[in-house]
Amino acid sequence: MHSRREASAAPFSHASAAVLWGLPLFRHVPEAVHVSDARHNGVVRHARGVARHEVSVPDDDIVVIGGIPCTSLERTVFDVARTLPLASAVAVADAALRLVAWDPEDRVYDQGAASTWATAMEERIARARGARGIRQARWIMAFADGRAQLPGESMSRLLLHDLGFATPRLQVRLADSSHLYFVDFGLDDAKAWGEFDGEGKYTDAQFRGERTPWEVVRAEKEREDWIRATTHRPLVRWGMQHLASPVTLGRRLAEFGIRPPR
């Protein structure tokens, strides 16, 4: 597809740019490759598997990744936040903030970097008042959090919000002199902990390293026992099968006596 459009200066954009940036397209399968140019502002034309957004893209909103021109991270999130379904767009915004502010080595979130980037995005959104999807984009940027590690955690955040839980703490650090653990969700209003379990934690060598699946399960059990005994809070796990709807996740939490305060 790239060879068919090399003669054009139009950069890849929207979901296609998100792919180039390594951002997850959670529950969204693009039907076309997206590019943007400035022929007729606001029109989207589809031809031969290409969706051409005829909108202006300034030079400082164009970067090159692997030799391929695409929209900048900020412009990509701006476009996606306005045009993709809410869950897909939140996963993209969370992942973009993670690129900006998360240090994977030290597991530290640079709140200053995150705030600076979010403010720039808010200013961009404010300048586009009245554009298609701008209300959703504004909500998403206020909701986005780069501490969400996986798209399933982003979706979990949305469903917890819909269920009426207070904003959870993410990647909560729990430690004593001999232990250091991180928990995905601190559900403080329910005095509980939550964990989203992607299947890769137990099966993907990238996540489990040299350990066998059984060794991973045993280490997780020891970790959970320590967290429960130390914090005196329940810990509930859920997986992708529980993210079908707020009701589905709510039922999973209720099995452990965890409900949003009324």
Describe the residue ranges of each PLM region.
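Short gly/ser-rich loop at a beta-strand->alpha-helix junction or flexible surface loop bordering the NTP-binding
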Residues: 1-133, 149, 260-262
